[in-house]
């Protein structure tokens, strides 16, 4: 579960109690039994979680509680032990604060706009485990190992290391701090995992095309529980079917044929990875988004975007089955609700930072993971392309002639067009062009279509049946052309895109 509603952000992730209660009921209704959160939530989350479970004692929900530190430290500090232990101190403080919150004993933690948030509900009996950390950037791990070569081992009250790297020593030390604090303060222990992802897994992927994606391992098998830690360790790994690229290129994965007689590199990777662990392993995240935009592709078709909601559901179910068949101890679908603040590498530069100006972006794959779709509109969208025209009743056309009427609606997410044809022609038989002008910087012609417009057009919508309908853009608005040809590959050297080159 994410932290935000569509129009809130990480600075003030305000979700009300009633919303959480509704969500917990919906989550339980789909036969899920555990909710994972990345970090401390607002007090209403824990209040609602406690109340929901008290009302449903026979089928309670369980919690996997994430603990992290400010991820910008990975860049600004660059070393887990750097700047006199700045990250260590922040991470250990987050651990002890989280333990206090879980045991309902905190009124000193600030949360968003709440300066002293009160956490007074003890939900510890419902906590299945703590998951410590972030998706570690390889250069952060490498720098930590390089700068702290003398930190070869750690032995604490409840955890110790064997053949560990300095970065793994950092994790062991932090985990031991959490376990020691919870044991001493609350006479309680909770299972602990250290978050990992495929980029820093303990395997070597010889066919990974990008060296940074297989540069350094984080092997939590080097961290061992001492006999005094009764709750024990488990492993938590984010596992996606499209990233990193090795999953598309590693021959032994691509050549793996599952019981459906289809290639299944995802399951092959799961099997390979599971063998590396002596503790229970869960998928801390897995899933695919139903966004229009695509950020990564999978040889299985399990792409990061470009999927229908039906495909999203089917692929998610198949991955859950693969995880179960490979005897993972559990799997957490990413994620419960759509979040509008999230961006992918190919959209982040063009997204507003102000949450009040934020809109859903169908081009951003990160916004389409939610099982719970968050659509524009306070109660409902102004239009839905479902074949019903009832929401257009009473609207005046913005354009009309003897054969055509064009109607327009807008909301936070989309521009809706409804074209009504006068006469006997069916939509399948019509071939129409609709030029769309946004700011007057477009083109007055579309060369390939031999069209000339009375005013500059930024986009051209061609309606030509189910298979040939398309939306064309003026070259000036082609973001991907600019990103690749100009910024990334330097194939073209220009100070700004040339305007009015034509729509194509």
Language-model segments: which ranges?
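Active-site-adjacent substrate/metal-binding segments within catalytic domains
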Residues: 1-54
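An active-site-proximal structural segment forming one wall of the substrate-binding cleft
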Residues: 24-29, 42-46, 51-58, 81-135, ...
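A solvent-exposed, charged loop/short amphipathic helix patch at secondary-structure junctions
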Residues: 85-96, 141-169, 249-259, 294-307
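Aromatic-lined carbohydrate-recognition surfaces of secreted/lumenal glycan-active proteins
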Residues: 107-119, 165-220, 237, 266, ...
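Glycoside hydrolase catalytic-domain groove-lining segments
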Residues: 207-299
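Aromatic-rich peripheral "rim/lid" segments of glycoside hydrolase catalytic domains that contact
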Residues: 294-301, 306-307, 311, 315, ...
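Surface-exposed, glycine/proline- and aromatic-rich loop segments on solvent-exposed faces
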Residues: 397-489
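Single conserved hydrophobic/aromatic residue that forms the stacking wall/gate
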Residues: 492-503
């Amino acid at each position: 579960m994410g932290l935000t509603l569509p129009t809130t952000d990480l600075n003030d992730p305000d979700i009300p109690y009633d919303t959480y209660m509704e969500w917990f009921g919906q989550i339980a209704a789909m036969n899920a039994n555990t909710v994972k959160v990345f970090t401390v939530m607002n007090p209403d989350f824990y209040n609602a979680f406690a109340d929901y479970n008290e009302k449903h004692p026979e089928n309670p929900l369980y919690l996997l509680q994430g603990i992290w530190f400010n991820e910008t430290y990975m860049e600004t500090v660059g070393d887990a032990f750097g700047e006199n232990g700045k990250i260590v101190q922040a991470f250990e403080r987050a651990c002890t604060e989280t333990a206090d919150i879980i045991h309902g004993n905190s009124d000193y933690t600030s949360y968003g706009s709440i300066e002293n948030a009160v956490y007074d509900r003890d939900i510890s009996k419902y906590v299945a485990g703590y998951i410590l950390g972030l998706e570690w950037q390889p250069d952060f791990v490498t720098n930590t190992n390089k700068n702290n070569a003398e930190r070869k081992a750690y032995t604490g009250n409840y955890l110790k290391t064997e053949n560990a790297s300095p970065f793994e020593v950092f994790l062991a030390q932090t985990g031991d701090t959490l376990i020691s604090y919870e044991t001493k303060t609350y006479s309680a222990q909770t299972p602990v995992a250290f978050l990992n992802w495929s980029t820093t897994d303990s395997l070597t992927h010889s066919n990974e095309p990008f060296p940074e994606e297989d540069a350094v391992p984080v092997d939590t098998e080097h961290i061992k529980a001492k006999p005094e830690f009764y709750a024990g360790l488990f492993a938590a790994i984010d596992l996606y079917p499209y990233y990193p690229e090795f999953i598309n290129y590693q021959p032994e994965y691509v050549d793996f044929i599952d019981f459906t007689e289809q290639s299944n590199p995802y399951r092959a990777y799961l099997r390979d990875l599971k063998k590396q662990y002596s503790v229970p392993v869960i998928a801390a995240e897995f899933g695919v988004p139903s966004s229009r935009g695509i950020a990564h592709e999978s040889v299985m078709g399990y792409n990061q975007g470009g999927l229908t909601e039906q495909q999203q559901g089917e692929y998610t179910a198949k991955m859950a089955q693969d995880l179960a068949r490979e005897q993972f101890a559990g799997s957490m679908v990413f994620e419960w609700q759509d979040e509008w603040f999230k961006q992918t590498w190919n959209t982040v530069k063009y997204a507003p930072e102000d949450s009040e100006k934020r809109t859903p972006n169908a081009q951003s794959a990160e916004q389409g993971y939610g099982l719970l779709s968050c659509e524009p509109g306070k109660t409902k969208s102004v239009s839905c392309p479902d074949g019903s025209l009832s929401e257009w009743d009473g609207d005046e056309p913005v354009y009309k002639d003897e054969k055509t009427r064009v109607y327009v609606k807008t909301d936070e997410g989309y521009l809706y067009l409804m074209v009504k044809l006068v006469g006997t022609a069916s939509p399948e038989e019509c071939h129409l062009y609709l030029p769309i002008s946004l700011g007057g910087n477009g083109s007055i012609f579309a060369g390939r279509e031999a069209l000339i417009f009375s005013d500059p057009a930024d986009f051209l919508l061609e309606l030509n049946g189910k298979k040939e309908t398309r939306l064309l853009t003026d070259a000036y608005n082609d973001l991907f052309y600019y990103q690749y040809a100009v910024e990334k590959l330097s194939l073209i050297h220009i100070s700004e895109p040339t305007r009015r080159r034509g729509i194509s």
